[in-house]
UniProtKB/Swiss-Prot annotation:
Residues 567-582 have a biased composition (Basic and acidic residues). Pathway: Nitrogen metabolism. Residues 1-32 form the signal peptide. This is Hydrazine dehydrogenase. Heme c 6 binds at residues 191, 247, 250-251. The keyword Metal-binding applies. It comes from Kuenenia stuttgartiensis. Transmembrane segments: none annotated. Binds 8 heme c groups per subunit. One of them, heme-4, is an atypical heme c (unusual heme c binding motif CXXXXCH) and is called P460. Catalysis takes place at heme-4/P460. The other c-type hemes mediate electron transfer to the external electron acceptor, which is a cytochrome c-type protein. Its EC number is 1.7.2.8.
Length: 582
């Protein structure tokens, strides 16, 4: 809205002869200083290739082909490269309803029988769950014309076959098809792909017991699978979804501190001070009509109310942890789009130079992490890590790949794996040096990017950003110094130290996927047990995709529904056997 007013004002001034052209007011700007040094994923993490001029470089071994993920929730088990090892909890059914609630083979039992109309639902639930009814009565659904959108519209009327509405259910032609289709346009890192992301190529969702990653599962499933994650049920008030706090549920915390960066920065301060003043923030208006005194999350990332919630830039592959080639055409396109958002309130020159400052900060952080990483890598190569990867319990793949080669395609056996296999950060049961390296890039470096991107420069430097990386670099060097001195002393006096057994086995360690693979599939790795489904490489027609995956499942000896999360009153415990084999 303010951008429109700016253009209108410029046109009026031109008409009055006050200024010459729109371009002289809005386009002319100083060019940002180009940064020469570009640290790309292959340089920081050992990933293959050179700077990618397409701009489609992804971190963690994720590939652009991933975006071909076929969305078909009727397929079972949940489609993903590692779905054979994806462990579930009964509560997941509410976050992934089409897969874990709405199919007959997994639908929870219900003591109530019969079919009911809206009025009957309201009468009963006014006693059983009065809060739901109060919220529903405040909603636009309850007041829809010519007839209310009732309980039976979304949940069905057969109490033995009730459904839990998914985003697909909301996205029908009769309801919110436009919004559903807009959300579906998102690529990697978007709400439209965050659920499948956790199953296709990433290991952290299948490495541990499900209780360990419940928070990961909630935030990586519900935004893709349910509209009610952002649109508070059962009111579904758009005004609530337009407030920045609505994003806070997922977008905060150690390794993705979006909320903290926004909240403590100037933009967040303006929001917090004025958010109850309807003249400054009128959330009853659509985003396309918004005229806020400062930006909300939605104002910048859902331009004009479009449901494809956008990352402003992909130049930093995975939250600032490495940098893609800045000569890429896609980088320029993304940066221009980012500036076009900022210039609703700021001059393009101001926006570009602030973003260039962010670039410098991320570049410096990459240099700092490369130095930190090299200290740890040299300990590994020289064989003085305590313990070495071979002395730990098997990693997620059933091997002993060095944890800091995340997403890397290894150079050989020195890193514990075979050339072409990828690693995964170990956040536990690893050397202190590895854990500090993980926190340096995963917690501190990401926050430098988030802080600079959201106007929280002081926080990006002082609290959990640049100065935090300084501390961890010092700690890694100090630990490395001790390790080398101890190794030299042991060699001098002839001590052959054997690592403690607690690195290899323990009550909790034995529950991890790696030890399970070694015990139950001797000589196999997760790469042998979970070959790439064909749809990771090609865009088959849906029927072909289903046939291909079902054939692969049959070859692996997995039957459809092996991940079923039945939870009947007979006492069956789905957590006890949440996978067919595990």
């Amino acid at each position: 809205m303010r951008k429109f007013l700016k253009v209108t004002l410029a046109s009026a001034l031109i008409g009055c002869g006050v200024i010459g052209t729109v371009s002289s007011l809005m386009v002319k700007e100083a060019k940002a200083v180009e940064i020469i040094t570009h640290w790309v994923p292959h340089e920081v993490y050992g990933m293959p290739g050179e700077p990618d001029n397409s701009g489609k470089v992804f971190f963690s071994g994720l590939k652009a082909k991933y975006m071909g993920y076929p969305k078909d929730a009727q397929r079972s088990p949940y489609p993903g490269k590692y779905s054979k090892f994806w462990k579930t909890l009964p509560a997941y059914r509410y976050y992934i309803p089409d897969y874990m609630y709405n199919r007959d083979e997994v639908r929870p039992s219900n003591p109530i029988k019969g079919t009911f109309k809206l009025e009957q639902c309201v009468a009963c639930h006014s006693v059983m769950t009065p809060g739901i009814v109060r919220d529903y009565n405040k909603s636009a659904h309850s007041k829809a014309e010519p007839a209310p959108t009732g309980c039976d519209t979304c949940h069905g009327n057969n109490h033995q076959k009730l459904t839990m509405p998914s985003s697909k259910a909301c996205g029908t032609a009769e309801c919110h098809e436009t919004q559903y289709n807009e959300q579906g346009q998102g690529g990697i890192g978007s709400h439209a792909s965050c659920s499948s992301f956790a199953q296709v190529e990433c290991a952290w969702s299948i490495e541990r017991p499900p209780g360990d990653t419940a928070g990961c599962t909630f935030c990586h499933t519900s935004p893709e699978e349910r509209c009610s994650t952002c649109h508070q049920r059962h009111q579904f008030d758009p005004a609530v979804a337009r407030r920045s706090e609505q994003c806070k549920t997922c977008h905060w915390g150690k390794d993705h501190r979006d909320w903290e960066a926004y909240d403590i920065g100037l933009h967040g301060t303006v929001y917090q001070v004025n958010k109850w003043d309807t003249e400054q923030f009128d959330f009853s208006k659509k985003l396309s009509d918004a005229d806020y005194v400062g930006p909300t999350c939605q104002y910048c990332h859902m331009r004009g109310g479009h449901h494809n919630v956008q990352r402003a830039s992909i130049v930093y592959t995975s939250m600032g942890m490495s940098m893609a080639d800045r000569g890429a055409p896609l980088w320029k396109e993304k940066r221009d789009r980012w500036v076009s958002i900022c210039d609703d309130c700021h001059s393009p020159r101001f926006a570009r130079e602030n973003l260039q400052a962010m670039d410098e900060s991320v570049k410096d952080a990459s240099l700092k992490y490369r130095e930190t990483f090299k200290v740890a890598e040299d300990l590994l190569i020289d064989g003085v890590l305590d313990p070495m990867p071979k002395d730990l319990c098997p990693d997620w793949s059933g091997q002993h790949i060095w944890s800091l080669k995340i997403g890397a395609y290894h150079d050989g056996e020195a890193y514990g794996g075979t050339t072409g296999e990828s690693g995964e950060f170990r956040m536990s049961n690893c050397t202190d040096v590895e854990r500090l390296c993980f926190e340096s890039v995963g917690y501190f470096q990401t926050y430098i990017y988030k802080g600079m991107a959201h106007g929280s420069w002081n926080d990006a430097t002082y609290s959990d950003g640049s100065f935090g990386m300084d501390r961890w670099l010092v700690n890694v060097k100090q630990n490395a110094s001790r390790a080398r001195r101890l190794a030299a002393l042991e060699k001098k006096v002839g001590i052959s130290w054997q690592p403690e057994q607690f690195w290899k086995t323990g009550e909790w360690l034995d529950q991890l996927t790696g030890p399970y693979i070694v015990k139950n599939h001797p000589g196999k790795t997760i790469f042998d047990l979970c070959p790439d489904p064909g749809w990771l490489d090609t865009h088959h027609a849906p029927a072909e995709e289903v046939e291909y995956i079902e054939r692969k499942l049959k070859e692996l000896g997995i039957t459809a529904g092996s991940h079923s999360a039945h939870h009947h009153e007979s006492g069956h415990d789905p957590a006890a056997r949440s996978m067919k084999e595990h």
